[in-house]
């Protein structure tokens, strides 16, 4: 079984997570979703089996939804996080505008 480095490593701990620990764990979960997307898409792009490709792509898309859910939760728990992501989006929007 893979070790994902979660706060509890698959077992309930004898204490609850602090809010800071929860926020860090959710960031990790976002990263894990992106890693899963990458693995599923690499596998889908590496086969000519249409069924496997379709199923893997569908699963990858579900992981994108999960990432969005975790991000929304993260924004609620750590409002500064959303502000920083928004700042990054605006910086790239400026670059895109400069290309036009």
Tell what function each PLM region has.
Residues 1-100:
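Iron-associated oxidoreductase/ferritin-like identity signal
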């Amino acid at each position: 079984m893979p070790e994902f480095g979660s706060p509890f490593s698959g077992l309930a701990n004898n204490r609850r997570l602090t809010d800071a620990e929860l926020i860090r764990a959710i960031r990790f979960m976002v990263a894990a979703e992106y890693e899963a997307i990458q693995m599923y898409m690499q596998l889908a792009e590496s086969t000519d089996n249409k069924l496997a490709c379709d199923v893997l792509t569908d699963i990858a898309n579900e992981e994108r939804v999960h990432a969005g859910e975790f991000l929304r939760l993260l924004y609620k728990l750590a409002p500064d996080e959303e502000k920083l992501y928004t700042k990054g989006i605006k910086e790239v929007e400026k670059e895109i505008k400069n290309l036009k």
